[in-house]
A protein has these predicted regions:
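A short, N-terminal "cap"/entry segment at the start of jelly-roll beta-barrel domains
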Residues: 1-43
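Short, acidic/polar N-cap/turn motifs at the starts of alpha helices
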Residues: 16-18, 58, 84
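Conserved hydrophobic/aromatic beta-strand scaffold that supports enzyme active sites
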Residues: 19, 28-30, 51, 68, ...
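Short strand-connecting beta-turns/loops that link adjacent beta-strands
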Residues: 25, 66, 92-94
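Tight coil/turn sites that cap or link beta-strands
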Residues: 36-37, 73-74, 80-82
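Flexible, glycine-rich phosphate/dinucleotide-binding loops
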Residues: 37, 60, 107
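A short beta-strand-loop-beta hairpin characteristic of the jelly-roll/cupin
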Residues: 45-46, 51-73, 88
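Ligand-binding loop in jelly-roll beta-barrel domains
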Residues: 82-107
Length: 107
Protein backbone atom coordinates (compact mmCIF):
# COMPACT_ATOMS: atom_id res chain seq x y z
CA UNK A 1 0.00 0.00 0.00
CA UNK A 2 1.37 3.47 -0.83
CA UNK A 3 2.54 5.59 2.11
CA UNK A 4 2.85 9.40 1.89
CA UNK A 5 5.97 9.36 4.11
CA UNK A 6 7.81 6.55 2.33
CA UNK A 7 10.89 7.71 0.45
CA UNK A 8 13.07 5.74 -1.92
CA UNK A 9 16.77 5.43 -1.15
CA UNK A 10 17.79 7.54 -4.15
CA UNK A 11 18.93 11.09 -3.51
CA UNK A 12 16.86 13.61 -5.44
CA UNK A 13 18.80 16.20 -7.42
CA UNK A 14 15.53 17.77 -8.57
CA UNK A 15 12.21 18.21 -6.85
CA UNK A 16 10.08 15.13 -7.33
CA UNK A 17 6.40 15.54 -8.24
CA UNK A 18 4.20 12.45 -7.88
CA UNK A 19 0.59 12.55 -9.03
CA UNK A 20 -1.63 10.76 -6.51
CA UNK A 21 -5.09 11.52 -7.94
CA UNK A 22 -6.19 13.46 -10.97
CA UNK A 23 -9.75 14.20 -12.01
CA UNK A 24 -11.69 16.59 -14.20
CA UNK A 25 -11.36 19.53 -11.80
CA UNK A 26 -8.74 18.43 -9.29
CA UNK A 27 -5.20 17.16 -9.01
CA UNK A 28 -3.53 15.88 -5.84
CA UNK A 29 0.23 15.42 -5.78
CA UNK A 30 3.06 14.66 -3.40
CA UNK A 31 6.14 16.84 -3.77
CA UNK A 32 9.54 15.91 -2.37
CA UNK A 33 11.94 18.86 -1.98
CA UNK A 34 15.56 18.46 -0.93
CA UNK A 35 16.88 21.99 -0.78
CA UNK A 36 15.40 23.16 -4.09
CA UNK A 37 14.07 26.70 -4.44
CA UNK A 38 12.41 28.78 -7.13
CA UNK A 39 14.75 30.85 -9.28
CA UNK A 40 14.95 34.29 -7.54
CA UNK A 41 13.95 36.02 -10.79
CA UNK A 42 10.85 33.86 -11.32
CA UNK A 43 7.40 33.53 -9.76
CA UNK A 44 4.80 30.80 -9.88
CA UNK A 45 1.59 32.23 -11.40
CA UNK A 46 -0.71 29.22 -11.56
CA UNK A 47 -4.01 28.92 -13.39
CA UNK A 48 -5.60 26.97 -10.52
CA UNK A 49 -5.96 27.48 -6.78
CA UNK A 50 -3.54 25.43 -4.67
CA UNK A 51 -4.04 24.10 -1.15
CA UNK A 52 -0.77 22.78 0.22
CA UNK A 53 0.34 21.21 3.51
CA UNK A 54 3.94 20.64 4.54
CA UNK A 55 3.92 17.16 6.07
CA UNK A 56 7.63 17.03 6.90
CA UNK A 57 10.53 19.48 6.95
CA UNK A 58 10.68 23.26 6.89
CA UNK A 59 10.18 25.74 4.05
CA UNK A 60 9.96 29.46 3.34
CA UNK A 61 7.56 30.95 0.78
CA UNK A 62 7.49 34.48 -0.61
CA UNK A 63 4.62 36.28 -2.30
CA UNK A 64 4.79 38.98 -4.96
CA UNK A 65 3.64 41.57 -2.40
CA UNK A 66 6.79 40.90 -0.28
CA UNK A 67 4.95 38.75 2.28
CA UNK A 68 7.17 35.97 3.67
CA UNK A 69 5.88 32.78 5.32
CA UNK A 70 7.90 30.22 7.28
CA UNK A 71 6.36 26.75 7.25
CA UNK A 72 6.99 23.81 9.55
CA UNK A 73 5.55 20.30 9.46
CA UNK A 74 1.76 20.46 9.71
CA UNK A 75 1.38 24.02 8.39
CA UNK A 76 -0.96 24.48 5.43
CA UNK A 77 -2.21 27.33 3.30
CA UNK A 78 -4.41 28.16 0.34
CA UNK A 79 -2.84 30.00 -2.58
CA UNK A 80 -5.49 31.50 -4.88
CA UNK A 81 -5.00 31.21 -8.64
CA UNK A 82 -2.67 33.84 -10.14
CA UNK A 83 -1.15 34.71 -6.76
CA UNK A 84 2.53 35.20 -7.51
CA UNK A 85 4.65 33.15 -5.12
CA UNK A 86 7.89 31.22 -4.91
CA UNK A 87 9.74 28.80 -2.67
CA UNK A 88 12.79 30.43 -1.09
CA UNK A 89 13.97 27.60 1.18
CA UNK A 90 13.35 23.88 1.67
CA UNK A 91 15.13 21.79 4.29
CA UNK A 92 17.41 18.94 3.29
CA UNK A 93 17.35 17.08 6.60
CA UNK A 94 14.62 16.19 6.96
CA UNK A 95 13.52 16.44 3.35
CA UNK A 96 10.31 18.34 2.68
CA UNK A 97 7.23 16.28 1.93
CA UNK A 98 4.35 18.36 0.60
CA UNK A 99 0.79 17.36 -0.26
CA UNK A 100 -0.72 19.74 -2.82
CA UNK A 101 -4.28 19.96 -4.10
CA UNK A 102 -4.80 21.95 -7.32
CA UNK A 103 -8.24 22.91 -8.61
CA UNK A 104 -10.95 25.53 -8.68
CA UNK A 105 -11.20 25.62 -4.91
CA UNK A 106 -12.81 29.06 -4.57
CA UNK A 107 -15.55 28.57 -7.16
Amino acid sequence: MPNIYELSQEVYQLEKFEQIVSGKNIQIERIISTGQTTNPREWYDQELDEWVILLQGEADLAYGDDTRIKLKAGDYLLIPAHTKHRVEYTSIEPVCIWLAVHGQLFH
